[in-house]
Amino acid sequence: MREALQSLLVALQFLTRLPVRLSAMPTPEQFGRAVLCYPLVGVLIGVVLYGAARSLDGTPPLLQAALLLSLWVALSGALHLDGLADMADAWVGGLGDRERTLAIMKDPRSGPAAVVALVLVLLLKFGALAALLGAGRPGLLLLAPWLARSSLPLLFLTTPYARPGGLGQAIAEHLPARSLPWVLGVSFGLALAFGLSGLLALLVTLMLFAWLRSRFLARLGGTTGDTAGALVELTECAVLVALAL
């Protein structure tokens, strides 16, 4: 139980900006075990968003959507948005070359592709949030962060890490590979409790995952922290839009 709680705290500290205090810097092994808790972190983010949505009942849907999206970004500290921006720049500027793509991902500067990607994703999220809230379906907000963070363990489990060194490789080397399939099965299975909406969200998540993973392998031969962050943002966006249509 103590080890499970430690893994959850490490996952919360890594994936969110919630005030989690650890007694010491987590070891690579602890970072690896924490991947088991990524889906739960997604659920917690969804619960916070749902609670915020209910507390804003009566607020005009557009304003409510803007406030919730701001909270959503604040909860993650824009961690995954940063990965999306880096990947967008690298994919455009890399011109199909692996080493050039990896080099651009490490460049802290943002180019036009990064800005456009961020604007489009945030705009789509805002529109989908407004539609869901306007339709009185705030409970579906749970699905996007939950399934997006469930896709991360699936990515680490099935895809080699493309860049040597760093935290990403440490996580990849210490994955609890025997436990992860069970966790993923439970996480994806529970999404079906939302009925047809859950099934739709799950299908969108898995189809997008398969396509993005194939792109990562074709360009990089694996994944990186930036592509993992992009996977989260694009999955959240796709699930929200699919549910809002």
UniProtKB/Swiss-Prot annotation:
Pathway(s) this gene product operates in, as recorded in its UniProt entry: Cofactor biosynthesis; adenosylcobalamin biosynthesis; adenosylcobalamin from cob(II)yrinate a,c-diamide: step 7/7
Required co-factors: Mg(2+)
UniProt KW keywords: Cell inner membrane, Cell membrane, Cobalamin biosynthesis, Magnesium, Membrane, Transferase, Transmembrane, Transmembrane helix
Enzyme Commission code(s) on record: 2.7.8.26
GO terms for MF: adenosylcobinamide-GDP ribazoletransferase activity; cobalamin 5'-phosphate synthase activity
Transmembrane region(s): 31-51, 61-81, 113-133, 138-158, 192-212
InterPro entries: CobS
Catalyzed chemical reaction(s): alpha-ribazole + adenosylcob(III)inamide-GDP = adenosylcob(III)alamin + GMP + H(+); alpha-ribazole 5'-phosphate + adenosylcob(III)inamide-GDP = adenosylcob(III)alamin 5'-phosphate + GMP + H(+)
Source species, domain of life: Bacteria
Enzymatic class: transferase
Location(s), subcellular: Cell inner membrane
A GO cellular-component term linked to this record: plasma membrane
Pfam families: CobS
Membrane topology reported for the UniProt record: Multi-pass membrane protein
Biological process annotations from GO: cobalamin biosynthetic process
Listed HAMAP family: CobS
UniProt family annotation: Belongs to the CobS family.
PANTHER family the UniProt entry points to: ADENOSYLCOBINAMIDE-GDP RIBAZOLETRANSFERASE
Biological function: Joins adenosylcobinamide-GDP and alpha-ribazole to generate adenosylcobalamin (Ado-cobalamin). Also synthesizes adenosylcobalamin 5'-phosphate from adenosylcobinamide-GDP and alpha-ribazole 5'-phosphate.
Protein name (Swiss-Prot/TrEMBL): Adenosylcobinamide-GDP ribazoletransferase
Organism, scientific name: Pseudomonas paraeruginosa (strain DSM 24068 / PA7)
